[in-house]
């Protein structure tokens, strides 16, 4: 009976001992992050750093409407193609939108010199002042200024560019001309002109009354002399002749001088440019909408404060940096490994092995206790708040450092610059690869550090409890301690807040340790007696059985027994 009581006492003591466990928060989150060492780690909380959505629309940029060129190209707009007349009144914009294949460009066929460079210059312009550099009615009294072409027709009638004048002879003469303009606008002025190349000498004589014409354009930074190239050419837009188009930027205070004795397509209007950060030219078929955004891409507007995006590499406005990543998620919480609910006396005793507690909702790290007054969860607010502050500051710092928002417009190359374009693409691809690698590596490293940081915090909390309890409790694994004394709610609270009174409970703990050790020793002695008794009994049964078998075999002659004296 004594043995049975001791065994029951031991079982009762182990089952109903007061217990406290250290663990961490868990929830039903399915967020996954990658670290340097692991992929798809499920975590309780994380933040997305990569924007992958857009609205599919063209929007105002900070309240300013874009300049939609519609069916016109940049060339058609800036030269004043008659079909682009509606664009003449537009003098300010947030960005410029050109469709992929606009119909109305240079209506009179010819070569547009340095067109890609002009587009690049205009991509940084947010407004201009269109003014008459050489008034039509007063600048050319000795020349005809009404030159038109069927290839530039408007409303079924022959017409010409609105920003240029086609000068021809007057009264059978084409006097030498010399005209200058001094830039007093205190801004760069864009000046455009053209040189006509007739298809035959007859047209040359009829229009300009000379066979040896020239055009000279000179400023402080530009000097060029043009000679018409008279030659038969294939018809383009029903024209065998050509007009080559040229432009220059005139600095404030500089003067440009035009001299010619024929073939000049003279400037009528010029443009005083106002540069603006965040402007640009994009090629897009996206529809315009009544929306406002800070970032515009050819695919649609992005409204995001995230540091990275994978929508499009060409952006206008304050935009996240483009990377080729499919996922950039930074952990802000802990590993999310909910404990097995059916295990342990508490239903979910977690810690360093089992997993986190879904019952603890007010913090990241904390305690679960069990005593005669019940059980419950409590977060350690100080360590949780310190961790939250540290991680929040880190995430904000990462976003701030990587969130260099800017405009990234595409570079323009003409058909003769394919090698340069291919080289540029390789360079851009290299930069994109570097940015993508840096972004991904940064997130991987920070995720690894954050998860290690949480593990360290839980272990520190465990060591804090262990150093208080000393030998007043024993470690039972999974981050739990079993008290050798009764620990009510007040006692539990003192352990949690670091004011546990070790001497107060040491005597009770010592007595209970000795009782438990005594129970173990007596139980061991009983088990030894039982083992000896069982061995002796088994041996006796074996000897009796062997004797009975021998006696039976001797009686029927199967076994002969001889006893010699």
Swiss-Prot record:
Entry annotated with the keyword Endoplasmic reticulum: no
According to UniProt, residues marked as the site described as Cleavage are 343-344
GO-annotated biological processes: clathrin-dependent endocytosis of virus by host cell; fusion of virus membrane with host endosome membrane; fusion of virus membrane with host plasma membrane; viral budding from plasma membrane; virion attachment to host cell
Q: Give UniProt keywords alphabetically.
A: Clathrin- and caveolin-independent endocytosis of virus by host, Clathrin-mediated endocytosis of virus by host, Disulfide bond, Fusion of virus membrane with host endosomal membrane, Fusion of virus membrane with host membrane, Glycoprotein, Hemagglutinin, Host cell membrane, Host membrane, Host-virus interaction, Lipoprotein, Membrane, Palmitate, Signal, Transmembrane, Transmembrane helix, Viral attachment to host cell, Viral envelope protein, Viral penetration into host cytoplasm, Virion, Virus endocytosis by host, Virus entry into host cell
Query: Glycans attached where?
Result: 27-28, 40, 71, 104, 142, 176, 303, 497
User: Using the chain's own numbering, where are the disulfide bonds?
Assistant: 21-480, 59-291, 72-84, 107-152, 295-319, 487-491
Segments on the Cytoplasmic face: 550-565
Q: How does it sit in the membrane?
A: Single-pass type I membrane protein
| Cellular-component GO terms for this entry | host cell plasma membrane; membrane; viral envelope; virion membrane
Where does this one sit in the cell? Virion membrane; Host apical cell membrane
A Pfam family of this chain: Hemagglutinin
- S-palmitoyl cysteine lipid sites: 554, 561, 564
PTM entry text:
Palmitoylated.
Q: What does the UniProt record say this protein does?
A: Binds to sialic acid-containing receptors on the cell surface, bringing about the attachment of the virus particle to the cell. This attachment induces virion internalization either through clathrin-dependent endocytosis or through clathrin- and caveolin-independent pathway. Plays a major role in the determination of host range restriction and virulence. Class I viral fusion protein. Responsible for penetration of the virus into the cell cytoplasm by mediating the fusion of the membrane of the endocytosed virus particle with the endosomal membrane.
Q: How does it assemble?
A: Homotrimer of disulfide-linked HA1-HA2. Interacts with human CACNA1C.
> What family is this protein classified in?
Belongs to the influenza viruses hemagglutinin family.
Protein name as it appears in the record: Hemagglutinin
Q: Which organism is it from?
A: Influenza A virus (strain A/New Zealand:South Canterbury/35/2000 H1N1)
Gene of this entry: HA
């Amino acid at each position: 009976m004594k043995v049975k009581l001791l065994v029951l006492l031991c079982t009762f003591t182990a089952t109903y001992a007061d217990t406290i466990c250290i663990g961490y928060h868990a929830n039903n989150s399915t967020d996954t992050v990658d670290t340097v060492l692991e992929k798809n780690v499920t975590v309780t909380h994380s933040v997305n750093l990569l924007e992958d959505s857009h609205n599919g629309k063209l929007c105002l940029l900070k309240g300013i409407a874009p300049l939609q060129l519609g069916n016109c190209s940049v060339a058609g707009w800036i030269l004043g193609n008659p079909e682009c007349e509606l664009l003449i009144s537009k003098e300010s914009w947030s960005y410029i939108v050109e469709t992929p294949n606009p119909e109305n460009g240079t209506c009179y066929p010819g070569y547009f010199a340095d067109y890609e460079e002009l587009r690049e210059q205009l991509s940084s312009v947010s407004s201009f002042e269109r003014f008459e550099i050489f008034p039509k009615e007063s600048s050319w009294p000795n020349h005809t200024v009404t030159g038109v072409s069927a290839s530039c027709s408007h409303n079924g009638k022959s017409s010409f560019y609105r920003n240029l004048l086609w000068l021809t002879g007057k009264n059978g003469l084409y006097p030498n001309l010399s005209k200058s303009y001094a830039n007093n606008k205190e801004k760069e002025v864009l000046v455009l002109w053209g040189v006509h190349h007739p298809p035959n000498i007859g047209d040359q004589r009829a229009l300009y009354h000379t066979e040896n014409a020239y055009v000279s354009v000179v400023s402080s930074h530009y000097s060029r002399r043009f000679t018409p190239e008279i030659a038969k050419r294939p018809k383009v837009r029903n024209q065998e002749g050509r007009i080559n188009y040229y432009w220059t930027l005139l600095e404030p205070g500089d003067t440009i001088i035009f001299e010619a004795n024929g073939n000049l397509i003279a400037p009528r209007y010029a443009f005083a440019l106002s540069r603006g950060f965040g402007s640009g030219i994009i090629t897009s078929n996206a529809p315009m909408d009544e929306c406002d955004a800070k970032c515009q891409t050819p695919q649609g507007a992005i409204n995001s404060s995230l540091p990275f995006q994978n929508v499009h590499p060409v952006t206008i406005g304050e935009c996240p940096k483009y990377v080729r990543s499919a996922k950039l998620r930074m952990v802000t919480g802990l590993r999310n490994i909910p404990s097995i609910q059916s295990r342990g006396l508490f239903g979910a005793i977690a810690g360093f092995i089992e997993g986190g507690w879904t019952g603890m909702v007010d913090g990241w790290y904390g305690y679960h206790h069990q005593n005669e007054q019940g059980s419950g969860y409590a977060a350690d607010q100080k360590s949780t708040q310190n961790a939250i502050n540290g991680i929040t500051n880190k995430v904000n710092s990462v976003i701030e450092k990587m969130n260099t928002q800017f405009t990234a417009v595409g570079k323009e190359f003409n058909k003769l610059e394919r090698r340069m374009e291919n080289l540029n693409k390789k360079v851009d691809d290299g930069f994109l690869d570097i940015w993508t690698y840096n972004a991904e590596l940064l997130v991987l490293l920070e995720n690894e550090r954050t998860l290690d940081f949480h593990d360290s915090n839980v272990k520190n909390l465990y060591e804090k409890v262990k150093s208080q309890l000393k030998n007043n409790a024993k470690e039972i694994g999974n981050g739990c301690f079993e008290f050798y004394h009764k620990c009510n709610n007040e006692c539990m609270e003192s352990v949690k807040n670091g004011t546990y009174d070790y001497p107060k409970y040491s005597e009770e703990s010592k007595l209970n340790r000795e009782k438990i050790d005594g129970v173990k020793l007596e139980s061991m002695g009983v088990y030894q007696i039982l083992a000896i008794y069982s061995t002796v009994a088994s041996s006796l049964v074996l000897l009796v059985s062997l004797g009975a078998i021998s006696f039976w075999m001797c009686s029927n002659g199967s076994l002969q027994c001889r006893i010699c004296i």
